[in-house]
């Protein structure tokens, strides 16, 4: 039986493995289809009932939740890494972690050139805030976690008022010259548009940053409360995390999906209809933490080790997903005319590859290839 420390770390890696695989489900859409298909499901890639079943599953269980789970684990790992630096006796652990995340920022800048949805740069910047907040009172952290995560809902309400019923910038906003390019929802909502525009670019930047920071802070809270340790009883995970989280999260996500359907994906509700889904992020992500922790405790190491290995190589796997998507959807096939079921087949194929190769690699090495390089540069000249 592994020690408590190893169990805690492996459980985090197990959950991270699930998260990095789950992220691909949504990220692949932006490579394979026009950007609008990610948000306006009716715009592209939905030609039959199978496609709509996939959309239903993605929106209820995956969309924003897997990124939320990934962000949560980043927050937890941030504290775990800082603790390990202090235990090892490094004199300036905060400088090391700042340097480590500066490297992450540089990688993210390069990554963003190939992938408009890069989150590494945002994570690296937000790590500065985590450095100042990670050891604050846990009730304050919980409050800030909820506030920042749900601020994106307020943001959606505000930005929706910037657009008219056709998805163009309203006359009032144009007259005030707030956004000089005068572009409305753009390619966020319309498949025939090729420009995102200043308004939606600002919305995305603030939205993603706030949600990421909120979930990172929640991850720190769960870590400090030992919910990521996989040490609680089965009934604790089921009664406190899984059941309430699933019930609340699924209902809220379902409300958003039904709202879009009822309004026939009208530009008038492009942002506000997603608010219930955003509110459902925390409940569902927390339930995933409970479910994954329970699975890690219950299933054989023979099977859990595949996900643990994938999680330990999350940095490598996340970037390799971009490379594979770029090659397949941008170089080999550039029509942007895929159906959802074709994309999900591709996703399953990549899952199998990453699970197998991660297990193979980690059975021979202590770290993934990019993790090894990142670590070497992080500790360069440090003592």
Predicted stretch roles:
Residues 25-28, 105-112, 148-158, 247-255, ...:
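Aromatic-anchored segments of alpha-helical transmembrane domains
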Residues 91-93, 129-147, 221-244:
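Solvent-exposed interhelical
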Residues 1-73:
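N-terminal signal-anchor module of multipass membrane proteins
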Residues 146-224:
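Long hydrophobic alpha-helical segments that form multi-pass transmembrane helix bundles
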Residues 264-363:
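Alpha-helical transmembrane segments of multi-pass integral membrane proteins
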Residues 8-14, 18-20, 239-242, 296-324, ...:
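Functional transmembrane helices that form membrane-embedded active or gating regions
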Residues 68-83, 120-132, 207-230, 278-300:
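Specific transmembrane alpha-helix
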Residues 46-60, 185-201, 264-271:
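Juxtamembrane membrane-water interface segments that cap and precede transmembrane helices
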């Amino acid at each position: 039986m592994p020690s408590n420390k190893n169990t805690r770390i492996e459980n985090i890696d197990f959950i991270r493995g699930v998260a990095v695989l789950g992220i691909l489900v949504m990220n692949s859409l932006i490579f394979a289809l026009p950007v609008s298909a990610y948000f306006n499901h009716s715009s592209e890639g939905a030609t039959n009932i199978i496609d709509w079943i996939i959309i239903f599953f993605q929106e209820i269980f995956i969309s924003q939740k897997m990124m939320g789970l990934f962000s949560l684990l980043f927050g937890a790992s941030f504290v775990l890494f800082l603790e390990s630096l202090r235990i090892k006796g490094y004199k300036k652990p905060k400088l090391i972690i700042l340097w480590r995340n500066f490297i992450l920022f540089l990688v993210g800048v390069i990554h963003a050139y190939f992938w408009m949805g890069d989150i590494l740069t945002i994570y690296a910047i937000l790590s500065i805030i985590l450095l100042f907040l990670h050891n604050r009172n846990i009730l304050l952290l919980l409050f800030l976690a909820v506030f920042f995560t749900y601020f994106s809902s307020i943001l959606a309400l505000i930005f929706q008022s910037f657009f008219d019923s056709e998805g163009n910038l309203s006359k009032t906003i144009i007259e005030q010259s707030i956004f000089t390019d005068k572009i409305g929802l753009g390619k966020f909502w319309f498949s025939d548009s090729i420009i995102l525009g200043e308004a939606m670019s600002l919305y995305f930047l603030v939205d993603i940053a706030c949600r990421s920071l909120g979930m990172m802070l929640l991850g720190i809270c769960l870590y400090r409360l030992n919910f990521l340790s996989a040490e609680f009883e089965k009934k604790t995970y089921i009664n406190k995390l899984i059941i309430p989280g699933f019930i609340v999260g699924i209902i809220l996500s379902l409300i958003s999906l039904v709202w879009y359907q009822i309004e026939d994906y009208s530009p008038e509700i492009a942002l506000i209809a997603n608010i219930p889904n955003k509110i459902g992020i925390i409940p569902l992500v927390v339930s995933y933490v409970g479910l994954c922790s329970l699975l890690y405790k219950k299933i054989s190491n023979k099977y859990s080790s595949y996900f643990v290995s994938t999680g330990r190589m999350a940095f490598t796997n996340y970037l390799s997903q971009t490379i594979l998507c770029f090659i397949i959807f941008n170089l080999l096939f550039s029509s942007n005319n895929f159906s959802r079921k074709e994309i999900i087949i591709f996703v399953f194929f990549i899952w199998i590859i990453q699970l197998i190769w991660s297990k193979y690699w980690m059975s021979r090495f202590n770290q993934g290839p990019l993790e090894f390089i990142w670590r070497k540069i992080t500790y360069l000249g440090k003592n």
